[in-house]
């Protein structure tokens, strides 16, 4: 049977965040765990869910899968048979290693992700971006306990505060004893009789927060900035998560970034190429003069040192590489044609292919 798309398996689309992927896996793995779900195909579905999570939860594997599909994922050992045991889902919930995690122990908050779109020139100069986020913060009414002021959470009388309950099942292999999240306290180890009227027992409320992000000059498409402690609130006094700002840089009409360097095509006239000329070339740092020697051919490259992208680490700028395109004249007068034929007779030179309308792009750029 053909494999299903990993995003489809988890019920997500390709824009899903790491948190979305983790939440979807937890929900589905709990639903189809063979020790809980007795349907005939539960084990196969659990295996499929685990395989999808193994690839999509790894940034490198996910990038390869997004680009090349299953073959790309296989390059990094993913996309094959899921090797996780049936106990793995409980390890995820309770810490693994044969020991359950204390549900009352401090836990770090979730990381958040935010995408910022920049123009190409903004990535050159850097900028300060103000972003508005809706994040979860500790409820001021109950101070994060989830209980009505004047009351407090109580130890769950079903699991005794452990957060798990023991379930016995009759299977073809005999009676099996398994542990699962407590059905009464949902793994927290506590119950709340009178919930906080503000947060309704969650201990957190959503709040809009403005964050200033300093984007350094020279940042590249896909790079991210980490803001420590700006993510989701911690649990039971644990530290807050982090905010990751992912930068997307829009393409430029003329410039193309190659690592820390910039490449561009520069059209020149037939006469400039043949006789040589001093031309004005645009760079991200302003226009500069470039001497084109006589006899320059299409494809000739010139290097402008230090005219590339700044370094985000504060080092030297990259360079700019200029590729010359010799433009074939068109709409010539009779006199021009006559002189060109005379030139051809003298030199035996043949015509060159016409290039596309680069002059229009350059004209537009210089007019800004």
UniProtKB/Swiss-Prot annotation:
| Chief localization | cytoplasm
Q: Does the keyword Repressor apply?
A: no
Q: What is this protein called?
A: Chaperone protein DnaJ
PANTHER family associated with the record: CHAPERONE PROTEIN DNAJ (PTHR43096:SF48), DNAJ HOMOLOG 1, MITOCHONDRIAL-RELATED (PTHR43096)
Q: Name one GO cellular component term.
A: cytoplasm
Family named by the database record: Belongs to the DnaJ family.
The record describes how the cofactor is bound as: Binds 2 Zn(2+) ions per monomer.
What are its cofactors? Zn(2+)
Domain (J) ranges: 5-69
Q: Tell me, what does this protein do in biology? A: Participates actively in the response to hyperosmotic and heat shock by preventing the aggregation of stress-denatured proteins and by disaggregating proteins, also in an autonomous, DnaK-independent fashion. Unfolded proteins bind initially to DnaJ; upon interaction with the DnaJ-bound protein, DnaK hydrolyzes its bound ATP, resulting in the formation of a stable complex. GrpE releases ADP from DnaK; ATP binding to DnaK triggers the release of the substrate protein, thus completing the reaction cycle.
What ranges of residues constitute the CR-type zinc fingers? 126-208
What molecular functions are annotated in GO for this chain?
A: ATP binding; heat shock protein binding; unfolded protein binding; zinc ion binding
**Keywords in UniProt for this one?**
Chaperone, Cytoplasm, DNA replication, Metal-binding, Repeat, Stress response, Zinc, Zinc-finger
- Where do the annotations place Zn(2+) 2 binding? 156, 159, 182, 185
Its localization reads: Cytoplasm
Entry annotated with the keyword Ribonucleoprotein: no
**What does the record say about domains?**
The J domain is necessary and sufficient to stimulate DnaK ATPase activity. Zinc center 1 plays an important role in the autonomous, DnaK-independent chaperone activity of DnaJ. Zinc center 2 is essential for interaction with DnaK and for DnaJ activity.
**Family annotation (CDD domains):** DnaJ, DnaJ_C, DnaJ_zf
Species this chain originates from: Exiguobacterium sp. (strain ATCC BAA-1283 / AT1b)
Q: How does it assemble?
A: Homodimer.
Give the CXXCXGXG motif repeat ranges: 139-146, 156-163, 182-189, 196-203
- Sites where the protein binds Zn(2+) 1: 139, 142, 196, 199
Instruction: Write down the InterPro entries for this protein, in alphabetical order.
Output: DnaJ, DnaJ_C, DnaJ_domain, DnaJ_domain_CS, HSP40/DnaJ_pept-bd, HSP_DnaJ_Cys-rich_dom, HSP_DnaJ_Cys-rich_dom_sf, J_dom_sf
Query: Which Pfam families does the record match to this protein?
Result: DnaJ, DnaJ_C, DnaJ_CXXCXGXG
Biological process (GO) annotations? chaperone cofactor-dependent protein refolding; DNA replication; protein refolding; response to heat
């Amino acid at each position: 049977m053909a494999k299903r798309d990993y995003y489809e398996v988890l019920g997500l689309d390709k824009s899903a965040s790491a948190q979305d992927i983790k939440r979807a896996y937890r929900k589905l793995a709990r639903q189809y765990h063979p020790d809980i779900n007795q349907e005939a195909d539960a084990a196969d579905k659990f295996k499929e869910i685990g395989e999808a999570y193994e690839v999509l939860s790894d940034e490198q594997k996910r990038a390869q899968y997004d680009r090349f599909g299953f073959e790309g994922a296989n390059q990094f050992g993913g996309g094959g048979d899921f090797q996780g045991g049936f106990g793995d889902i409980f390890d995820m919930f309770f810490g693994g290693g044969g020991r359950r995690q204390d549900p009352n122990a401090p836990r770090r908050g979730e990381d958040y992700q935010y995408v910022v779109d920049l123009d190409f020139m903004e990535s050159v100069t850097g900028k300060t971006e103000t972003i508005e986020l809706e994040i979860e913060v500790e409820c001021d009414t109950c101070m994060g306990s989830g209980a009505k002021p004047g009351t407090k959470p109580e130890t769950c009388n079903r699991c005794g505060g452990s957060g798990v309950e023991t379930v016995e099942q009759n299977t073809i292999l005999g009676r099996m004893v398994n542990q699962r999240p407590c059905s009464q306290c949902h793994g927290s180890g506590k119950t709340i009789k009178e919930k906080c009227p503000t947060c309704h027992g969650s201990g957190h409320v959503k709040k809009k927060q403005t964050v200033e992000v300093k984007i350094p000059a020279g940042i590249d498409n896909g790079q991210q900035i980490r803001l420590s402690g700006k993510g989701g609130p911690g649990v039971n006094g644990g530290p807050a998560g982090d905010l990751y700002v992912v930068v997307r840089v829009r393409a430029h009409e003329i410039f193309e970034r190659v690592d820390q360097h910039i490449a561009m095509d520069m059209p020149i006239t037939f006469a400039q190429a043949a006789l040589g000329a001093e031309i004005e070339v645009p760079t991200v740092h302003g226009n500069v003069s470039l001497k084109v020697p006589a006899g320059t051919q299409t494809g000739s490259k010139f290097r402008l040192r230090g005219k590339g992208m700044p370094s985000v680490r504060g080092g030297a700028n990259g360079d700019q590489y200029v590729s010359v395109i010799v433009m074939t004249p068109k709409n010539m007068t009779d006199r021009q044609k006559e002189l060109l034929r005379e030139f051809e007779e003298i030199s035996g030179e043949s015509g060159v292919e016409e290039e596309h309308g680069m002059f229009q792009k350059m004209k537009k750029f210089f007019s800004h």
